[in-house]
Swiss-Prot record:
The gene is yugF. The keyword Hydrolase applies. Gene3D superfamilies: alpha/beta hydrolase. This is Uncharacterized hydrolase YugF. It comes from the Bacteria. Belongs to the DmpD/TodF/XylF esterase family. Residues 29-131 form the AB hydrolase-1 domain. Keywords: Hydrolase, Serine esterase.
């Protein structure tokens, strides 16, 4: 019997969203939400470890990955959270557990605050936190024609390898599959124009007062060597989220789904029980 492809697409609020659905009827649904400059690809090591136990959905947040690089969508965290909710409503999911990495953690928290009845628990993997909105000068700059070329130049200068070296602790983990998986979406020229809008529209992270209203059970997992979102941010989020627990992983950087998939999968399974 031929295996059913998990690849799906659905249009929510006028933007076409790519997602993967590893169906396991009757089981708890997990929704994997990736971080900035990433995609569902970042969960590729975690999903095989959990797919026998759970119904898993992993999406590409626009404009990243294989989702549409819309030039009309308003790229706020609130709107991206609505896309997550829209996919779940389309699939008639009654209740889910959010698993958000980095920026995806903020979007997961926004989704849980927007529609609390849809989500039972939240898992935050090195979640971003307490970031302010972009400086007004940068926001103004996004209105300048060809600003997208500055973004392209910046990303080209940094390069996929340099970015990966910055987000993992053990450099030996970086291989050709990883470089290709994280770099391929940026071969589409349209992403740079969409990212201009993303920079323009992105609001700041949730304020402490908003976080304190989040009474869902929350599991926080952090890499002790995270140079992107340091451990101190995890401790602050743990203090502000009233029903949270924090685990730290030694010898681990920011890209925890790639670096510690087995350990993360075990923590998630224990948390959901």
């Amino acid at each position: 019997m031929e295996a059913v492809s998990p690849i799906r697409r659905f249009t929510v609020d006028g933007v076409n969203v790519y997602y993967e659905h590893y169906q396991n009827p009757g089981r708890q649904t997990l929704v994997c939400v990736h971080g900035f400059l990433s995609s569902a690809f970042s969960f590729r090591k975690v999903i095989p470890l959990l797919r026998d136990k759970y119904d898993i959905i992993a999406l590409d947040l626009p404009p990243f990955g294989q989702s549409e690089k819309s030039r009309t969508f308003i790229y706020t965290y609130q709107n991206l959270a609505k896309l997550v909710i829209g996919i779940l409503e389309h699939l008639q999911v009654k209740q889910a557990v959010l698993v958000g990495h980095s920026m995806g953690g903020q979007i997961s928290l926004s989704a849980a605050l927007q529609k609390p009845e849809l989500f039972s628990k939240v898992v935050l993997l090195c979640s971003s936190g307490y970031l302010k909105r972009s400086h007004p000068t940068i926001i103004f700059g996004t209105h300048i024609p060809y600003f997208h070329l500055y973004i392209k130049r910046w990303l080209s200068k940094e390069g996929v390898m340099k970015n990966l070296l910055n987000v993992v602790h053990d450099k030996s983990l970086i291989d050709e599959e990883m470089i290709d998986g994280y770099g391929r979406p940026f071969q589409d020229e349209q992403i740079f124009k969409a990212m201009t809008r993303f920079i323009r529209h992105r609001e700041g992270d949730l304020e402490p007062e908003q976080l304190k209203k989040m009474n869902k059970p929350a599991l926080l997992i952090w890499g002790e060597e995270d140079r992107i979102v340091p451990m101190e941010i995890g401790k602050r989020l743990h203090a502000d989220l009233p029903n949270s627990v924090l685990y730290s992983l030694g010898q681990t950087g920011h890209l925890v789904p790639e670096e510690r998939p087995e350990l993360i999968s075990e923590h998630i399974a224990d948390f959901i029980k």
